[in-house]
Amino acid sequence: MSQANAHEQALALSAAMLAIDDVILLATTGQCPERDLSALLPSLLRQNQARLEDYFLEIAPFEKGRALLVNFLINGVSSEHVRYLIQVTVLEEKLSANRALFAQLLQRLNEAESAAEHFPLLHDAMIARFADIYQASVSPAMRKILIHGNPDYLKQPQIAARVRVCLLCAVRAVGLWRAYGGSKWQVIFFRKRFLKALRALRF
C-alpha cells in the first residue's frame, strides 16, 4: 500500500461515505446538500482521468465523508453509514463480476453523457436518468439494498430518485477506490496507515 495509493483510496472512500450520508439524509429528512451531488455526479461520466480528484467537480464536500470514516476507525463502532458502505462495496464487486450488466451500465452512462450536453447534471431529467440507470443496470447485481427512513419521504418519486442517484455515486466511488488498489483487507490490516491517509487529506 504505497503512500500515493493510500491518499487516493482515502479520498475515494470519503466520497463514497459522503454519498451514503446523503442517502441517509434524503431518507430521513427528504433533502441533502445540492453541493454534495454537484461534486459527486461528474464522476459518473468521467473516465481515465489523470488524478482521482479530476473525476469530481470538487472535493471539499468529501470532508464530511472523511470525518465519518475517521470516527469509525477510531471508535470501532458500526453505524448505519458503515452498514450501507459494506453493502455498496459488495454491490460494486458483484456488478464488476457481471460482464453483461456492467457493459449495459457503461452503455447507458455513455448515453447519459450525450444527454448532459443538453441538461445540467442536477436537472430533473438527468436525475431521473441516473436513477433509472441505477435501478436497471446496477441494483440487479444483488439483492436490493433496503433503505431505512421516513416512508413519507421515500415514497416520493423525486426523493426516491435522488436516493438511487446517491447510491450510484457511492458505487462509482467504491469502484474508483478499487481501481487504486483498495480492498477490505487493506483497511483491516493497514488500519493505522489508512487512518493516517484520511487525516492527511486536505480539502
Curated annotation (Swiss-Prot):
InterPro entries: HflD, HflD-like_sf. Its main location: cytoplasm. Gene3D superfamilies: HflD-like (1.10.3890.10). It is found in: Cytoplasm; Cell inner membrane. The keyword Cell inner membrane applies. Belongs to the HflD family. HAMAP family: HflD_protein. SUPFAM superfamilies: YcfC-like (SSF101322). This is High frequency lysogenization protein HflD homolog. GO terms for cellular component: cytoplasm; plasma membrane.
